[in-house]
Every structure is written in structure tokens, then in C-alpha cells.
């Protein structure tokens, strides 16, 4: 029987089982507590998370996976990579949060998606004039903190190549990888400090960048980087961790470098099986427990996979692992008391995945299986048999409808639709609008909570929602917005709201995961076939419409976003699930336009998230994702204007796909990126209309009228005003009313000033 290290967790959630970190951060930002309370709660969370893993028998437990905001931001702080505009902030806590969130006078650093997940990281801003230097306090302190509880952790670090590749240059023309000679000495110094901590220390370098299509030059830098780092100290055991796809090129590059191990994802990167003979005796951190989805592991399938791995890797060199950090899944099923018991039995959250690792280690490493161990396998397989036979999963009516789809696209070219829409809508040049949601006040959250818990009646709830809509419509009219929204007070989440009204979805009580900073989301769970039993948004939109003579947008979430922001069933192709959702959204659009709604927004905020990281897999995704969106809007008449919204995206590589989606208006997030994103549309000759977000809603900072006028003028240098809409860069639900009153008012004033100037020029 093998008795060595057998189990490994890439990283653990940090927001807290009851969102303790979120709550204390927001109290601190509201100046209702001191940093010492954050520090105390953070220490308690780290201790709890370490002990969970220790109790589950995990061999490799992490330190420095914890962060108060984001690990990429932590790494920038570690390297003293602080942009010049923050140089006057000397308090380290104030500096940290200013870089992430901005201040009244300073724009925050850019934020974007972490690969193809719904987690967002802060994008470091680098230049060759930066004085990089090491600040290792957090890393060293957390390692020592864990030792106080009897734990010798592996230390998690963002690897140099990933850090540089995901950073952006202050000078837009610079290649950030050219800065490797400047930051590598900081990493070397860090490793020397770590080597002094113990006679043997394990260090995990997260290098997910190598699962993308990287060029030969980057691979060479990757090789040189780890060749140098591996020679710092014989006390260190270096592990290069990859995840989200295969890393076959990197495995070959690392073949002759004396590192301890390589982490490979065998759930989303099965091609990794092809290069196991290149490990050369290194430990294989085998990612076999899905760190991105919430379904129970099929032990039989995983054991079969491990037997395949064992053909090329000695059993004693295999360590069973999660595919990636468990940051992407909720904490524990123990908090879920209202889930259907069958569906709950099919699930596994972070703490349950620890137990799955322990189970698989027993099944794989123990050669003479006892009755107890065999029972573990049998119980697991029984659950999968029951799921396969469950009537809760398949709806024959849905299957028949999908099989008989005849209409997949709407009528008319964009030019035909645009002409009809301009006549019907009669909007001014540079029309102003918002993305949809307005601030979710404590009062409105309490209203929803009380209704859900049967504390108030349906009439009381409806009255509260209508009062909010009344105020929201009145506010928008007062400041002069051109196209209004109802504010979405009835919606806790843009996906959950629709999931609650569609069949095939289930919801957790406490399934929160971190999206960015203190922002948490509670993804819906798709477990079965999807359909729409009845209209989902008609009543609230029609009520809002009755309160104004202006146009009110219908607000829907698109099928691809609903899919990508949900935990999707694992027994059906994602494309087939998306098609089912698209049919449900199509029915809703049809009902909305019949009710007189002239503009309908179908948000595809998460469209880019679903993109595979490897080019060879992209065409397949684009094909079914575009088809699903077009199927969803195929019921829209020519004169019905379809808007869509996309978040945090680099559009260079998907502009052709956006063209195929053919939305009449697309709103995008550009406020932290200047005109860089917009230029892509201009260069391409994009014909449809665009609403580039002109201010950053993720920061509490209120932009001035003059600043916004300048942004609009800059937009018009790239695209003609006839194609432009003026709007914030995202929904406003996370902001406070006091913030948005001024921001939106300034935005409208800026648009009106520019519009007036254009009209004067036109009549000269």
C-alpha cells in the first residue's frame, strides 16, 4: 500500500461560507469599521479553510491562495508594480483598495475575466520605468500563520509568465513579456526568503497562460524562467500548475527542468494524456476533480482515467487533485436544506470535493480494497444509476419541440431593420439609456426576502415593487434619459430571476461564489430539460410603460449568458441545453412585442466567457452560441429593436462573431480601456449601432460633465454619432443611489451638450 502524499487542492474559496469577507469589506468601505476587523475575520477564515482540508486528509494545502480582493492585484503589490497615479497614497491598505476600486479623484485599474470563468481579476499596469521590488510580507506571514496550526502549506504564487501575459503596458506598444528580466529577480529573492522558512517548502506557480495558444518565444521565456527558478534552492519543491485546458507544449518544455511536479487538467484538457511520457519522473498533480462545476464525480470514470494515466506515470508519482482552485464553486452542501433530495445527491461543492479526493485516493492507492472501500464505489455508482433513470431530467415535450424548429433567424437585413426602427422610435442623435438594473437598496432586498419567507403578502410585495418602479421611472424622466428601464427591483440576479421561471433549473440557498472583490454571485443550476411555463417579465414592463410616454426597454438575459453563468448539467452537450433556453427566450420576446414593447434588450454579458482557450475549439463554440442567440431573437419583428450587452471583453478576436449575432444595438464595457475596444469595431467596418460604456460603474467615483463630454468626443473620432448610444458600461445594481444620481445626470448633460453642438454644425 502506498502511504505517500496522495491528494492536492489547487486553492480554496475565501469569501466565507456566510460571505463574511464580503460583509466586512463593505462595512470598511462604508467607513463603518476599521481594518483590524477585516484582519481578524480574514485570519479566522484562513484557519477554518485550512482545518477543513486537514480534516479531510488533504496532503497539499495552500497558503497565499487567500486574498482580500484578488491574487493578481496581490502579485502587483508584491512586485511594487503600482501605477504612477496612485503614488500619492502612502497607507498600504488605502493603496490596495484604491488600485482595485478607484477613488473620487483616481480611476481604478482595469478589471477583466480570469480566462473563461466568471471570476474577474485586476489587470496590472506595467512599464519599463517601474522600480520593481519585492514585498513578501503577506506570503511569509500566511505561511507562518498556518504553521501555528500545525500545517506546512504549499505556497501559491501567480507565475511570472502568466502575470506578465495578463498585465497591460502603460505604453500601449510595449510587450509586457519584455519585463521578465526586471521582475524575475524579485521572484528569485522571494524564493530565497521562502527557502529560509523550513527545510522543505512546496511552491505552486499558477501558470494557466500556457493552456492558451502561446507562441514559441513565450515558451522559450517560460523555459528560461523556470530553469532559473528551479536552481534557487534545494530546499524548494516547485510545482507548475496549469488548468482550464491542456498544456502539452508546456509539459514538453519543462521536461528536463528539475521541478517537483506539474499540475494538469484532465477534465477540460484530456489531450494532456498524450504527453505524460515527457514528465521524466516528476510528480503529476492530476486534476481529476472538476473545480468549475458542482456535479458529483463519477468514481468509476475517474478510476478508468487514472488507469490510463498509470500506463505512463508510476502510481507513486501521481497525486490526485482538483482541476483548478475551488474558488469557482460554493462552499458546502450542508447549508442547502431546501434542495430536492435527489438533485442534491447529484451535487458536490468545495467541501464535498475534499471528501471526493479522499475517497478516490482510497480507491486508487489502496490495492487490497476492503468492504468499506468497495462500498464507497458502490454508493457513488448507485447515485449515477438513479440520476440516469430519473424523470426529473427529461421532458419529452421539450425534446419534440427542439426537433421541430423551423424558424431560426429574424427577418430583414440590418439596414432594413434600422430604417424601420428609426421611423418607429424617433430617437434623437446620441440617444441616452442605461444597461438595465438600478441600485438594489437594502429596502428592496428586504422586500424580496420578506416575500420569499412569507413575511408579507403578494399585495404588499407588488406595491413595494411598483413604488420602486415609480421612483425609478420618475428619476429617469427628471434627468432626461431618452430610453428608460424599469430598474429590475424584482430581480435578485439576472440569471437566477429567469431560472426561477423556467423549468429544469434549481436554486441554492447559500451557493455563493466570488465574482470580484466583495461581489458574489449565486449561480443557478441547470439539471434537466428547459422550458417556459408562462410569461416571465410582461407584468412589470407593462407597469413601467404605463408610467411614462417615453420608450421603456424590455430586459431579458440571453440564452448563452444563462448557460455560461449557470452550473450546467453534465449529461448533455452544452449546445443542446442552450438551444432549449433560446426557445424559452424567443417565446418571451414574442409576448413582449405583442404587448407593445418597442426595444428589447437580450443581455449576453457572458458570451465571451464560454469561449474555449484553444483556437482549434473556438469555431464549434461560436457556431452553436451564435445560432442560439439568433434563435432566441428570431421572433422579433423588423421594427422591434434588439439590443444586447457584453461585459469585460477583448473584442479583437470575436468581432466577426458579434457581426453574425446581428443585434441592432450592442452596448459594451470600454470605460477602463479607452477607445481601444471601440477601434476594433471601426476598423472592421461594423454596421450596427454601438453603446460604448462611457463611465465605470464598478468604481464609486462620479465623473464630471466635462470628462464625459471629452469621452463622447473621443468616441466620435472612431465612429460616427449616428451609430452611437450613450450609456454607462454596465448595470447599476451594485451602486448606491447617491452615486448614480450624479453620474447619470452628468452623462445626460454631456450627451445633450454634444448633441446641441452637432445640431448647430448641421444647420450652419
Curated annotation (Swiss-Prot):
<feature type="binding site">
    <location>
        <position position="647"/>
    </location>
    <ligand>
        <name>Zn(2+)</name>
    </ligand>
</feature>
<feature type="binding site">
    <location>
        <begin position="435"/>
        <end position="437"/>
    </location>
    <ligand>
        <name>L-homocysteine</name>
    </ligand>
</feature>
<dbReference type="InterPro" id="IPR038071">
    <property type="entry name" value="UROD/MetE-like_sf"/>
</dbReference>
<feature type="binding site">
    <location>
        <begin position="519"/>
        <end position="520"/>
    </location>
    <ligand>
        <name>5-methyltetrahydropteroyltri-L-glutamate</name>
    </ligand>
</feature>
<feature type="binding site">
    <location>
        <position position="488"/>
    </location>
    <ligand>
        <name>L-methionine</name>
    </ligand>
</feature>
<feature type="binding site">
    <location>
        <position position="730"/>
    </location>
    <ligand>
        <name>Zn(2+)</name>
    </ligand>
</feature>
<keyword id="KW-0028">Amino-acid biosynthesis</keyword>
<feature type="binding site">
    <location>
        <position position="669"/>
    </location>
    <ligand>
        <name>Zn(2+)</name>
    </ligand>
</feature>
<keyword id="KW-0489">Methyltransferase</keyword>
<dbReference type="GO" id="GO:0003871">
    <property type="term" value="F:5-methyltetrahydropteroyltriglutamate-homocysteine S-methyltransferase activity"/>
</dbReference>
<feature type="binding site">
    <location>
        <position position="113"/>
    </location>
    <ligand>
        <name>5-methyltetrahydropteroyltri-L-glutamate</name>
    </ligand>
</feature>
<keyword id="KW-0479">Metal-binding</keyword>
<feature type="binding site">
    <location>
        <position position="565"/>
    </location>
    <ligand>
        <name>5-methyltetrahydropteroyltri-L-glutamate</name>
    </ligand>
</feature>
<dbReference type="InterPro" id="IPR013215">
    <property type="entry name" value="Cbl-indep_Met_Synth_N"/>
</dbReference>
<feature type="binding site">
    <location>
        <position position="488"/>
    </location>
    <ligand>
        <name>L-homocysteine</name>
    </ligand>
</feature>
<comment type="similarity">
    <text>Belongs to the vitamin-B12 independent methionine synthase family.</text>
</comment>
<feature type="binding site">
    <location>
        <begin position="19"/>
        <end position="22"/>
    </location>
    <ligand>
        <name>5-methyltetrahydropteroyltri-L-glutamate</name>
    </ligand>
</feature>
<dbReference type="Pfam" id="PF08267">
    <property type="entry name" value="Meth_synt_1"/>
</dbReference>
<dbReference type="GO" id="GO:0008270">
    <property type="term" value="F:zinc ion binding"/>
</dbReference>
<feature type="binding site">
    <location>
        <position position="609"/>
    </location>
    <ligand>
        <name>5-methyltetrahydropteroyltri-L-glutamate</name>
    </ligand>
</feature>
<feature type="binding site">
    <location>
        <position position="603"/>
    </location>
    <ligand>
        <name>L-homocysteine</name>
    </ligand>
</feature>
<dbReference type="Pfam" id="PF01717">
    <property type="entry name" value="Meth_synt_2"/>
</dbReference>
<feature type="binding site">
    <location>
        <position position="603"/>
    </location>
    <ligand>
        <name>L-methionine</name>
    </ligand>
</feature>
<keyword id="KW-0486">Methionine biosynthesis</keyword>
<dbReference type="GO" id="GO:0032259">
    <property type="term" value="P:methylation"/>
</dbReference>
<feature type="active site" description="Proton donor">
    <location>
        <position position="698"/>
    </location>
</feature>
<feature type="binding site">
    <location>
        <position position="645"/>
    </location>
    <ligand>
        <name>Zn(2+)</name>
    </ligand>
</feature>
<comment type="function">
    <text>Catalyzes the transfer of a methyl group from 5-methyltetrahydrofolate to homocysteine resulting in methionine formation.</text>
</comment>
<keyword id="KW-0808">Transferase</keyword>
<protein>
    <recommendedName>
        <fullName>5-methyltetrahydropteroyltriglutamate--homocysteine methyltransferase</fullName>
        <ecNumber>2.1.1.14</ecNumber>
    </recommendedName>
</protein>
<dbReference type="GO" id="GO:0009086">
    <property type="term" value="P:methionine biosynthetic process"/>
</dbReference>
<feature type="binding site">
    <location>
        <begin position="435"/>
        <end position="437"/>
    </location>
    <ligand>
        <name>L-methionine</name>
    </ligand>
</feature>
<keyword id="KW-0862">Zinc</keyword>
<dbReference type="InterPro" id="IPR002629">
    <property type="entry name" value="Met_Synth_C/arc"/>
</dbReference>
<dbReference type="InterPro" id="IPR006276">
    <property type="entry name" value="Cobalamin-indep_Met_synthase"/>
</dbReference>
<comment type="pathway">
    <text>Amino-acid biosynthesis; L-methionine biosynthesis via de novo pathway; L-methionine from L-homocysteine (MetE route): step 1/1.</text>
</comment>
<keyword id="KW-0677">Repeat</keyword>
Amino acid at each position: 500500500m502506498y502511504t505517500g502524499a496522495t491528494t492536492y487542492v489547487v486553492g480554496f474559496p475565501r469569501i466565507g461560507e456566510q460571505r463574511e469577507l464580503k460583509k466586512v469589506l463593505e462595512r470598511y468601505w462604508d467607513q463603518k469599521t476599521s481594518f483590524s476587523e477585516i484582519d481578524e475575520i480574514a485570519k479566522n477564515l484562513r484557519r477554518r479553510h485550512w482545518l477543513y482540508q486537514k480534516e479531510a486528509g488533504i496532503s497539499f494545502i495552500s497558503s497565499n491562495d487567500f486574498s482580500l480582493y484578488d491574487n493578481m492585484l496581490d502579485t502587483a503589490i508584491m512586485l511594487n508594480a503600482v501605477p504612477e497615479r496612485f503614488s500619492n497614497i502612502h497607507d498600504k491598505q488605502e493603496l490596495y483598495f484604491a488600485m482595485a476600486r478607484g477613488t473620487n479623484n483616481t480611476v481604478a485599474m482595469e478589471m477583466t475575466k480570469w480566462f473563461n470563468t466568471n471570476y474577474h481579476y485586476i489587470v496590472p499596469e506595467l512599464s519599463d520605468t517601474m522600480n520593481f521590488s519585492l514585498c513578501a510580507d503577506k506570503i511569509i506571514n500566511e505561511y507562518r500563520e498556518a504553521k501555528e496550526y500545525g500545517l506546512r502549506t504549499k505556497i501559491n504564487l501567480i507565475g511570472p509568465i502568466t502575470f506578465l501575459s495578463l498585465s497591460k503596458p502603460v505604453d500601449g506598444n510595449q510587450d509586457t513579456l519584455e519585463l521578465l528580466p526586471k521582475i524575475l529577480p524579485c521572484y528569485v529573492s522571494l524564493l530565497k526568503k521562502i527557502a529560509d522558512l523550513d527545510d522543505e517548502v512546496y511552491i505552486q506557480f499558477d501558470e494557466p497562460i500556457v493552456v492558451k495558444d502561446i507562441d514559441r518565444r513565450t515558451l522559450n521565456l517560460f523555459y528560461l524562467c523556470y530553469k532559473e527558478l528551479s536552481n534557487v534552492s534545494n530546499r524548494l519543491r516547485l510545482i507548475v500548475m496549469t488548468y482550464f485546458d491542456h498544456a502539452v507544449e508546456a509539459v514538453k518544455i519543462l521536461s528536463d527542468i528539475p521541478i517537483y511536479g506539474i499540475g494538469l487538467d484532465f477534465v477540460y484538457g484530456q489531450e494532456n494524456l498524450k504527453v505524460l511520457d515527457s514528465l521524466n519522473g516528476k510528480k503529476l498533480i492530476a486534476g481529476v476533480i472538476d473545480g468549475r462545476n458542482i456535479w458529483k464525480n463519477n468514481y468509476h470514470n475517474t478510476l478508468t482515467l487514472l488507469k490510463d494515466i498509470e500506463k505512463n506515470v508510476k502510481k507513486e508519482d501521481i497525486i490526485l487533485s482538483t482541476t483548478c482552485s475551488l474558488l469557482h464553486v460554493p462552499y458546502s452542501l450542508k447549508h442547502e436544506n431546501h434542495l430536492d433530495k435527489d438533485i442534491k445527491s447529484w451535487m458536490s461543492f468545495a467541501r464535498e470535493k475534499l471528501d471526493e479526493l479522499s475517497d478516490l485516493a482510497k480507491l486508487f492507492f489502496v490495492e487490497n480494497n476492503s468492504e468499506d472501500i468497495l462500498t464507497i464505489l458502490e454508493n457513488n455508482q448507485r447515485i449515477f444509476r438513479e440520476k440516469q433513470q430519473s424523470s426529473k431530467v427529461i421532458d419529452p415535450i421539450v425534446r419534440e419541440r427542439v426537433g421541430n424548429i423551423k424558424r431560426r433567424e429574424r427577418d430583414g437585413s440590418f439596414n432594413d431593420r434600422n430604417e424601420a426602427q428609426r421611423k418607429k422610435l424617433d430617437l434623437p442623435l446620441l440617444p441616452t439609456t442605461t444597461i438595465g438594473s438600478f441600485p438594489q437598496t437594502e429596502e428592496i432586498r428586504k422586500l424580496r426576502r420578506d416575500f420569499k419567507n412569507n413575511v408579507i403578502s403578494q399585495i404588499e410585495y407588488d406595491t413595494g415593487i411598483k413604488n420602486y418602479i415609480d421612483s425609478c421611472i420618475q428619476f429617469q424622466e427628471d434627468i432626461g434619459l431618452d430610453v428608460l428601464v424599469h430598474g429590475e427591483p424584482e430581480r435578485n440576479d439576472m440569471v437566477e430571476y429567469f431560472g426561477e421561471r423556467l423549468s429544469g433549473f434549481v436554486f441554492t440557498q447559500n451557493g455563493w461564489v466570488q465574482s470580484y472583490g466583495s461581489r458574489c454571485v449565486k449561480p443557478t443550476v441547470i439539471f434537466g430539460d428547459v422550458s417556459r411555463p408562462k410569461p416571465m417579465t410582461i407584468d412589470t414592463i407593462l407597469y413601467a410603460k404605463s408610467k411614462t410616454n417615453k420608450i421603456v426597454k424590455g430586459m431579458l438575459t440571453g440564452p448563452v449568458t444563462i448557460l455560461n453563468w449557470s452550473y450546467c448539467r453534465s449529461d448533455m452537450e452544452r449546445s443542446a441545453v442552450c438551444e432549449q433556453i433560446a426557445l424559452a427566450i424567443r417565446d418571451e420576446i414574442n409576448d413582449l412585442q405583442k404587448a407593445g414593447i418597442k426595444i428589447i434588450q437580450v443581455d449576453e454579458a457572458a458570451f465571451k466567457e464560454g469561449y474555449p482557450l484553444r483556437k482549434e475549439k473556438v469555431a464549434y463554440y461560436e457556431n452553436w452560441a451564435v445560432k442560439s442567440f439568433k434563435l432566441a431573437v428570431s421572433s422579433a419583428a423588423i421594427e422591434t429593436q434588439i439590443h444586447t450587452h457584453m461585459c469585460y471583453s477583448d473584442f479583437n478576436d470575436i468581432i466577426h462573431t458579434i457581426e453574425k449575432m446581428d443585434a441592432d444595438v450592442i452596448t459594451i464595457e470600454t470605460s477602463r480601456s479607452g477607445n481601444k475596444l471601440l477601434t476594433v469595431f471601426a476598423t472592421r467596418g461594423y454596421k450596427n449601432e454601438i453603446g460604448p460604456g462611457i463611465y465605470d460603474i464598478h468604481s464609486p467615483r462620479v465623473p464630471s460633465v466635462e470628462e464625459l463630454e471629452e469621452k463622447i468626443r473621443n468616441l466620435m473620432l472612431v465612429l460616427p454619432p449616428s451609430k452611437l448610444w450613450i450609456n454607462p458600461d454596465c448595470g447599476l445594481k451594485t451602486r448606491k443611489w447617491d452615486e448614480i444620481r450624479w453620474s447619470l445626470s452628468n452623462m445626460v448633460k454631456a450627451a445633450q451638450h454634444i448633441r446641441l453642438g452637432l445640431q448647430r454644425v448641421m444647420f450652419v
